[in-house]
Amino acid sequence: KPRFVAGSIGPTNKTCSMSPDVNNPAMRALTYDELADAYREQMEALLEGGVDALLIETIFDTLNAKAAIFAAEKAMEATGIQVPVMLSVTVSDTGGRTLSGQTLEAFLASVQHANIFSVGLNCSFGARQLKPFLEQLAARAPYYISAYPNAGLPNSLGQYDQTPADMAHEVKEYIQEGLINIIGGCCGTTDAYIAEYPALIAGAAPHVPAPKPESLWLSGLELLEVTPEKNF
């Protein structure tokens, strides 16, 4: 079977959208250009190392993600190597927003300019708690959908108690309902969890991406979808 390696690009420990000082809301720990340069250096090394895709993951700040997308385009231009760009978002609570405050629909609007292969969710919660947000993405995103949830939620000692079989039972709903194209595992998972997946996907139909929106999408913290019915 073919095997593909995605180069992982994490969110960094800095944010372009929020201040690290509650007494100075305008302060930023770094600039967009500084972050894009850091991403580009990493991505060029990954491309030269032979990765099959660039995976910008655990996205908590959309502006960080946009810097990473820009860096990916520049890195591929510099190296002459073109690979798919994958995005994976993390939501900060059961309200379904990123840490920087966006809904998932608003996030999609923010990155619609880019040539994206897939968009998905990782970390955040276990498979069952992540499902409602995965449904939101699957209904609106004109891309392939990925998911790699945690092995449930951590206990009081920071450990994960969910077994591979229990997690597979929850992930099976994603597959049966046609929500995903790419499945994996995040915090608390090991190869034993991933080993459960081949049996789940055998003969299953993949998710069919939603059509591209025909109306204008504008992004703030929430999506504004401009249609003829709206006087705007």
Range-by-range predicted roles:
Residues 1-232:
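Domain-level signal for soluble alpha/beta catalytic cores
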